Amino acid sequence: MQIRPIEPGDNEALAKVIRTALAEFGANKPGTVYFDPTTDALYELFRTPGSFYYVATIDEVIVGGCGIFPTENLPQGTCELVKLYLAKEARGTGLGKQLMEISLSWAKENGYTKVYLESMPELAKAVSIYEKVGFKALDHPLGNSGHCGCDIWMLKEL
């Protein structure tokens, strides 16, 4: 297992991991990253200042990723934990938690004081992991992610 920064050639494989995972959980619906055109151009998206994306590989095959993004209209000092998805074979290995911890560390090292995320009931297992690492439920969304299909919003202080 290796975790590394996103590279220009990663877009297609990452989009496939993300969309396959969403479909497996029945979360491939409008208003989610499944239909978000930026899912096909993650390398370009994560060239945005204040953002970073980590890619996980097993035997040089991309099996997931996770990132930090300065989503529009979030409160001062807040970033969003985004696009944490794993291929089926990488789930249950601790890799998701590792990706999340590395991303949260990057956020803190880069001056963020809070991390926001959006999810949905179909991804209940992920939501329970977020709670275990200190994310707290909110009763409304923050910022403007454009993902109206997400109705679980959480925030963590770093």
Describe each region flagged by the PLM.
Residues E60, G64, G94-G96, G134:
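Conserved phosphate-binding and hydrolysis motifs of nucleotide-dependent enzymes
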Residues T20, E24, G92, S105-E109, ...:
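Conserved amphipathic alpha-helical interaction elements at protein-protein interfaces in regulatory
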Residues P5-E89, M100-I102, P141-G143, E157-L158:
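Acetyl-CoA-dependent GNAT
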Residues M1-I3:
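Extreme N-terminal starter segment of soluble prokaryotic enzymes
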Residues Q98-K114:
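Conserved acyl-CoA
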Residues A87-E89, T93, P121-E122:
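Active-site acidic-Proline motif in GNAT/NAT acetyltransferases
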Residues T20, T113-Y116, M120-L158:
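C-terminal "cap" of GNAT-fold acetyltransferases
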